[in-house]
Amino acid sequence: MQWTVTFYSEKVKNETLALPSGILANFLRVTELIETFGPDLGRPHTAPLGRGLFEIRAKGREGIARSVFCTVKNREMIILITVIKKGNKIPKRFMETAYQRQQEVLGHA
């Protein structure tokens, strides 16, 4: 049974699909793998972040992007936020935004 990859909002979808072409190509490849094999691909594709959040690591000649996602029932994963990586860690404010969105999606807000 396949997984479904969706976005938290149209804004998140548009921001993600506006990634530079090399990064976007890698992101789309990873999401295809997730649809087939599930989100637990392991590094270098996906990694746990804690608190029920995970990341997709998309690399291209232009740099690295990270998309934070959570999983919900019926084999669905929701991309909560995407950011171009500028340092070693995802900025705290982006993680807080992702966590708040996760709580909303899961009905805990």
Language-model segments: residues:
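Basic, Lys/Arg-enriched alpha-helical interface segments
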Residues: 1-64, 73-77, 84-109
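Hydrophobic/aromatic beta-strand elements that line small-molecule binding cavities or substrate pockets
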Residues: 67-69
